[in-house]
Amino acid sequence: TLESPEAAGVEMSLSPDGSRLVVTWPVVKGAGGYEFTLYNVDDFEKPIVIGVEKEVIDGCSAVREVEADTKYMAAIRTLGNEQYNNKEAQTASEIPYSTLAPTDATIESGDISAWLVANPIPADKIGQEYTIDLVGGREYIVSDVIDFGNQQVTIRGSKVNHAKIKMVGNASFLTNKGFKLKFADVDCAEMTAATLLGTSTTPDASSQVASGEYVVSTPIMLQGCNVTNLGKKLFYDMNKVKYCIDYLGFDDCNIQMLQSDVLVHAAKSSIIRMD
């Protein structure tokens, strides 16, 4: 009886544009081919087949289309070869792969703003994207303004079980470098701040261009979020600094507005792209 390819020998890599996953595995001598399946395992209890299930491959590689921020698992099983009286492998090798950005820190619960005060971004991470995970289904609050300044930060919940965030008082997220909030349910009923998202009142001097604007070249965005009870602005540049924002985005979001004022307000700034 043959064995399936060893998981340690399987290589998985993204195409340059990130749209396809290329999976290669070592040859199993005497094999009559391989059975390949790729699963989306964001919800491990309910895997979703990507492409052809149990595709028979006469070779040692397979390609599947993939998406960002997704967990996958490849299953590869060696098939038998009657010519050599080799029987197929009884089980498949299972190899996990994720297109999620690596986690730098995890907040288990509680006040996100207080946690960030107690756990500042490490000096060796300044200038790099810093990803903070929230635990799926857990409840959090933001009790004060969080100004990330010139640090590019992503706060990320779970795609299949959103983190629950309650914005309280002067709570808001400000940045001059780019900020993403992903996969969270955000309740703004108790938020008194002028905006949920905004630009920092202290710009990054190195980002200033000849026109006098300060360029925010990385996205400011919500992705996969449900925002409820929003009685203030969704985005506001705080009317302090003249920014040029390359991209302001709201991807796969539901936003409940409880006001008829301007939702996105760039008083001094310009926004190149918004969707």
Please provide the spans of the model-predicted regions.
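Short glycine/acidic-rich loop motifs that flank beta-strands on beta-rich extracellular proteins
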Residues: 83-84, 143-144, 166-171, 189-197, ...
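Beta-strand-rich modules
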Residues: 62-86
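Extracellular beta-strand-rich solenoid/capping regions of secreted or surface-exposed proteins
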Residues: 18, 139-154, 164-217
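Right-handed parallel beta-helix/beta-solenoid
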Residues: 43-52, 88-121
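Right-handed parallel beta-helix
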Residues: 178-190, 216-231, 243-262, 268-275
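Pro/Thr/Ser/Gly-rich low-complexity, intrinsically disordered linker/stalk tracts
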Residues: 1-30, 68, 83-100
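N-terminal extracellular ligand-recognition/capping segment immediately after the signal peptide
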Residues: 108-153, 158-170
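Extracellular low-complexity, O-glycosylation-prone stalks/linkers
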Residues: 28-52
